Amino acid sequence: SFPASPRAPTAIVAMVATLGFPAILTLSRVSTRPEALRGVENPSPYGYTVSLSLFLLPVIVLSVFHMIRPRHHTHRRALLAASGVIAVLGFVLDTFFGHSFFTFRNEAATLGIRLPAWDWSALRWVPAYLPLEEFAFYILGALFVITTYLWFSEYWLQDYEPQEYQANTQTVGRLVQVSWPSLALWTALLALGLVFKRIGPDPDGFAGYFIFLMVLGFLPTFLFLRAVAAFVNWRAFAGSYAALMLVSLVWEATLGVPYNWWNYKRDQMLGIEVQAWSGLPLEAVLLWLVIAWDCVIAFEIFRVFFHMDRKPMQALFGHGAAAKE
């Protein structure tokens, strides 16, 4: 008989079920078509809350698998550390900029538990503005991307054996190595976005969300990209990004924005919208890439760091870079 393989049809069936069941459950919460929403009081009861199962169920399935059978003990530590960093970044986004960038008009789609948000225009806290579900998303979204990346990397598109990976980390002089080509590209894209905001169809306001994504979403990773790029399984990254896009097309483009679980303050956007997705702004689509990129890069930074077995300052900057005996 043929040896067991993760590519067996049972693995594919399990994957489809893990994504399909929460998708069916989420879609079942909707009782009205988007074009018929006018005058409908509650078209998607608890829809936002239930939709988080799109991330929760895959996270549970893949996390249990990874925790039971990690290829190396550093994977578990790196997964938790990277997920924590990305979740904190999401908390900062919502807590300090959620009032500036987002609206949450459909309270019936949530549990009704809301947290305060900072209003920069009035320099005060706005009580009961952010749905609790927002914070759950940032935790689950980070875990979803990293566990999916690990699944692709270890069981479908493997690049390294654990021993080879660990040996290669010892050749890294320091983690902080600025990627100047990436920084130059980042600068050009940032400038292009700001120019477009001023000469585009919606010049009023300020491209705050775009700037946030570019500065806090991409820029920090360029400090480490040269050091960890060789350790990233780029095929697995593509797989995890594709999985996130698939879920996001259902979660945000089909449901979240059309049913006003959340929406965007247009004066804080560039003005580029996808009309087929209820005017979804470009920044929302860019966030899908930011989440996937940050999660994978952060995971590999922590994984390389834990394998290096050096003191933090030595690992980051190469001072006394020899590994501990």
What are these regions (language model features)?
Residues 1-325:
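Aromatic-rich, lipid-facing transmembrane alpha helices and their immediate juxtamembrane interface loops
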